[in-house]
Amino acid sequence: MEENKEFLLTQEGYDKLEEELENLKVVKRKEVAERIKVAISFGDLSENAEYDEAKKEQAQVEERILKLENMVRKAVIIDESKIDLNVVTIGSIVKVKDLEFDEEVEYTIVGSTEADPYDGKISNESPVGKALLGRAAKEVVEVQVPDGVAKFEILEIRR
């Protein structure tokens, strides 16, 4: 994990991180501690699979908590009211036309922490995200993809 990296987030993305962090601290920690307690009650810890599994889960939970705390501490929340609708920026919702397949697709450009391609949220660091940033409606962008070059026409930019 990069110690000095800022995490660009929308307010929605920040709220989700806060919610996950709270759940891990308040709910998951207690669940894992209870599982450890039960596993200890089984006796001999040297051959106690339940104990080993619970301790591994505890380590994973604590690692995730530390990671989320770092992300929340270094979060930079994008002020969506200040998004320039003339060019693509983080927080923009961009409708593009794939010129090869003649299909329209809509992407929300987000920081890498929030990226979820299945939900149409692509990272500003992804090949498509990078190509769209700073571009205006009606422009055609070319993106290097594994199969060659994809061409997209920017149809609309909104927030």
From Swiss-Prot:
SUPFAM superfamilies: FKBP-like, GreA transcript cleavage protein, N-terminal domain
Domain of life: Bacteria
Database matches in NCBIfam families: greA, PRK00226.1-4
HAMAP family: GreA_GreB
Cystine pairings recorded for this chain: none
Keyword Coiled coil included in the entry's annotation: yes
Gene source species: Clostridioides difficile (strain 630)
MF term (GO), any: RNA polymerase binding
Protein name: Transcription elongation factor GreA
InterPro entries, per database record: GreA/GreB_C_sf, TF_GreA/GreB_CS, Tscrpt_elong_fac_GreA, Tscrpt_elong_fac_GreA/B, Tscrpt_elong_fac_GreA/B_C, Tscrpt_elong_fac_GreA/B_fam, Tscrpt_elong_fac_GreA/B_N, Tscrpt_elong_fac_GreA/B_N_sf
Pfam families named in the record: GreA_GreB, GreA_GreB_N
Calcium as UniProt keyword: no
Family note: Belongs to the GreA/GreB family.
